[in-house]
Design a protein with these regions (language model features):
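Mixed-charge interfacial surface used for oligomerization/domain docking
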Residues: 1-82
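C-terminal non-catalytic interaction/assembly regions of soluble proteins
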Residues: 53-143
Length: 143
């Protein structure tokens, strides 16, 4: 979901243009236009739309999931955590248990304002791997 495009390097202009009251849903990480546009809405309404699109692709009922809320480069952390709270509430109403959240700027699109949401359905092996220590530039888990 994006509330703005990014300025494409070498092109010098946005990949798409939104009206003042529009958001783009399903845009590409490189600034490509999305699959639909809608008017700006409250956080819960936007997250409802995004979760509906994600949850219709796979049955997550009675599952544990890892959730990634990825900032696109121009979104304050506070807004990402508002989105996280809304996702948490929605998942719990659908009998989906969030095991771990990753919230931050993991794969940005320059200065684009918005976020992407990813769910990973977990089994015991994936949970063990997610909990394993790692120390990279983009992610640190454990000591």
């Amino acid at each position: 979901m994006s509330m703005s495009s990014c300025i494409l390097p070498g092109v010098g202009k946005p990949g798409f243009v939104l009206k003042e009251n529009e958001i783009e849903i399903g845009m590409g990480i490189h600034g490509e236009p999305g699959i639909e546009r809608t008017n700006v809405k409250k956080a819960r309404e936007i997250v409802d739309i995004l979760c509906h699109k994600i949850l219709k692709d796979m049955d997550y009922t009675n599952s544990e999931v890892a959730v990634i809320i990825n900032g696109l480069g121009g979104t304050p952390a506070m807004e990402l955590y508002i989105i996280t709270k809304e996702i948490d509430e929605i998942l719990k109403t659908k009998n989906i248990t969030p095991y771990k959240y990753f919230v931050g700027n993991f794969m940005t699109s320059l200065e684009m304002a918005g976020c992407s949401i990813s769910l990973l359905k977990l089994d015991s092996e994936l949970k063990q791997l997610l909990d394993a220590p790692c120390n990279t530039i983009g992610l640190k888990i454990g000591d």
